[in-house]
Amino acid sequence: MATKISQDNPLSKITIFLIIISVIWVKLNVKPWEKGKVIDWDIVDYYDYLPALFIENDWTLSFVKKNEEYYYNNHIYWPQKTSEGNYVIKMSMGLSYLYLPFFWIGHLEAKIKGLPTDGFSQPYHKWIYLSAVFYFFIGLWFLRLFLLRWFRDKVVAIAIILLVLATNLFYYATHESAMSHVYTFSLFSVLIYLWDRWFAYNKLLTGMFIGFISGLIVLIRPINIIPVVVFPLFYNLIDIKQIKDRVVYLLTQYQQIILMVFFAILPWIPQFYYWHLNTGQWFYYSYGDEKFFFLKPQIINGLWSYRKGWLLYNPLMYLTILGIPVLWKYRRSLFWSYVIIFPLYIYVVFSWWCWWYGGSYGGRAMIDIYPVLIFALAAIIDRIFNLERSLRFFKYVSMIPAFMLIYWNILQIIQYRHTFLHYDSMTKEAYWKLFGKPALSDTAYWSLLSPPDYEKAKRGESEYP
């Protein structure tokens, strides 16, 4: 049953502030901007819309032709080429909206310090990197507000601590934080809170925010249309048969739904314009020969492989499976949205040709739906706190594996940071050779790695050589 949010709930508040302080501390110690290692790889494509528009004043990227080798080799601009020879940025521009205020802060700092104002000097890297802290705080705060509708303060606090510190979310909040996942995690946390408020109070302004945030989430990562659509259909249903009533209710609110759709389209309008400007098409698939293989989903590999198994490298998330019957029995209102989003998302995510998602840590694609997966985690924690007095000792014993999971995640992050836990080439032999060690001096270890065959994977074949 949902509970009224207390104005106090100090433990979960303190938890979030301590997490953010920890994230900032790690960031200020890592300082990747000093080596220009923030706006790089995928982030180049998320970010390039901003300097191209506001500094080069050229969204067609025609200036790249003048020195193409320099731009590509230095990972500054590396757009795709259309069949007509035009340039088009591969990723959609959703993250650029979120980067924008921090881009201008970096631009101002570069001007004040007399550094190049080309969009790629150190201040730009720094502020894009730090932008994730702002959005991560917002995401955690709204996730907390949502969870407090269903769970006690101490349960929410512990669930958030474990979700952040014992999973790959912590790595992407502190190290590669300019990647999309912390941003989409945060936006989806806000979205589920807004849907809860909309169903409770049916406010027009809430609906407008729901629409815009939904459109932005999908623009950043189109695969996220799954939780964006499924959650409001199945949230807070006790019985699956109530889906008919939910659809009927939404149809009776057609004016607000139309308004939501309108606001969902708004963030896409500049993207449509950009595609049309550079390709002549209002909608353009910029991923070339990269695609989904829905008849060959790599679910087993995606969850358990040594290369990049999500559950292997995030063992805490086994509780997201074990917690399903707990949700069914004790938090039925959260159950249906959970059991539909979770397997459907796994199926689609691991149907992508590059199911291991390139150079990354621990199945990063799953982070986007962590605001939903925390339901089962919180439900299990809640049941532990509700054990009979004779079993209360289990509550304290359970703290041991909780601390071990946090320790294990931090250890793996250290391994990954120093490339011992390899970004795409782990094998069974390498995993067990490295197991439990922060580093290795044995040079023979590197011969145990097995890089994936990306070209074979693009054809839907096994990437193992």
PLM features: what roles do these ranges have?
Residues V230, L237-I240, T252-P325, R332, ...:
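Membrane-lumen/periplasm interface segments of specific transmembrane helices
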Residues M1-K31, I138, L148, V156-A157, ...:
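Start-transfer (signal-anchor) and selected internal transmembrane alpha helices
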Residues L50, I160-I161, T206-P222, V228-L233, ...:
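Membrane-interface alpha helices of multi-pass inner-membrane proteins
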Residues P10-D40, D48-P51, D58, I161, ...:
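Transmembrane signal-anchor helices characteristic of membrane glycosylation enzymes that use polyprenol
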Residues Y183-Y201, L205-S214, V372-A376:
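Specific aromatic-rich, kink-prone transmembrane helix
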Residues K13, K111-Q122, L140-T167, S186, ...:
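Transmembrane-helix signature of polytopic, membrane-embedded enzymes
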